[in-house]
Regions:
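Concave beta-strand-loop units of leucine-rich repeat
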Residues: 22-30, 39-50, 59-70, 79-90, ...
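Short amphipathic alpha-helical segments
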Residues: 56, 76, 98, 157, ...
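Short alpha-helical interface patches
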Residues: 137, 158, 260-261
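Canonical leucine-rich repeat
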Residues: 34, 51-54, 71-74, 93, ...
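N-terminal capping/linker segments that flank leucine-rich repeat
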Residues: 1-33, 41
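Short, surface-exposed loop and linker segments with low hydrophobicity and enrichment for Pro/Ser/Thr
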Residues: 15-19, 97, 179
Length: 269
């Protein structure tokens, strides 16, 4: 597709396209190529199953290529701020691309086994991917989603603080980084986690149902609700523990509560 054809298809002017002002939405189309050197604020290419490659020197604030099943790689020259590549066959994200990204969503990318070295990113969702390890220097500010990443066995020690963390259904993940502070919600349901960091802090909800947790360290602090239902290896709670919201213990093996336990919400036994 040439620039002229792109302008006609999307009803935008060549001037706007050349000046980087054109909003381009080609989702669900049969487009199989795009012109090189595109500079656009937003480029939607959802479910363009005939598209086999992205143009060279593509510069976009937001790029959505989710469902582009014929795409297997990204150009090294790609410059993008928000990248959505859910349900694609992409196996690797270029390292230079990661330096610019504020947000990456790679949900259900079954060929994505690793991501390159990255220091800090706002949002990273790799749920349903076959990712085996995360960069040792990784820092995520807002959200880290790893739901169902069954090949993941550990999280980097550099992950000290994150707004929201979801590692539910990570069957081979046994522990969390030491001194972890999750500002809002922490989800570990149906994961392989068997122990919590001694100084874990969660600002809001802690969701840990259907795990093999055996103990809750006395220094763990949770700001909101706590769901420990179906934790069949958990026999006790810390003495003097304070739960500021709902406490779910249904179908756990806790038969006796600590004498000085404080629950400020509903208690479900």
């Amino acid at each position: 597709m040439t620039k002229e054809e792109l302008c006609r298809y999307c009803s935008v002017s060549m001037e706007d396209l050349d000046n980087g002002c054109a909003y381009i939405d080609l989702s669900n189309s049969s487009v199989d190529s795009l012109p090189d050197n595109l500079n656009v604020p937003v480029l939607f290419l959802r479910n363009c199953t005939s598209l086999e490659r992205l143009p060279e020197n593509l510069n976009a604030f937001s790029l959505d290529i989710s469902g582009c099943t014929s795409l297997t790689s990204l150009p090294a020259s790609l410059r993008v701020g928000i990248l959505t590549l859910d349900e694609t066959n992409i196996s690797e994200i270029p390292e230079f691309c990661m330096d610019m990204c504020q947000s990456i969503s790679a949900v259900d990318c079954k060929n994505l086994k690793r991501i390159p070295k990255i220091h800090k990113i706002g949002r990273l969702d790799l749920s349903g991917s076959v990712i085996e390890a995360l960069p040792e220097t990784l820092e995520v500010c807002d959200y880290l989603g790893l739901v169902g990443c069954k090949n993941l066995t550990s999280l980097p020690a550099s992950l000290k603080q994150v707004n929201r963390l979801n590692v539910s259904q990570c069957e081979n993940l046994r522990s969390l980084p030491e001194d972890l502070f999750v500002i809002e919600d922490l989800h570990i349901e149906h994961s392989g986690i068997v122990r919590l960091p001694e100084n874990l802090m969660v600002g809001n909800g802690f969701y840990a149902s259907h795990t093999d947790l055996k103990t809750i360290p006395s220094q763990v602090r949770i700001g909101g609700l706590v769901d420990l239902s179906y934790c069949k290896k958990l026999f006790s709670l810390p003495e003097g523990w304070i739960v500021n919201g709902y406490l779910g213990l249904a179908h756990s093996w806790i038969h006796e509560l600590p004498e000085h336990l404080t629950v400020k919400g509903n208690l479900d036994l």
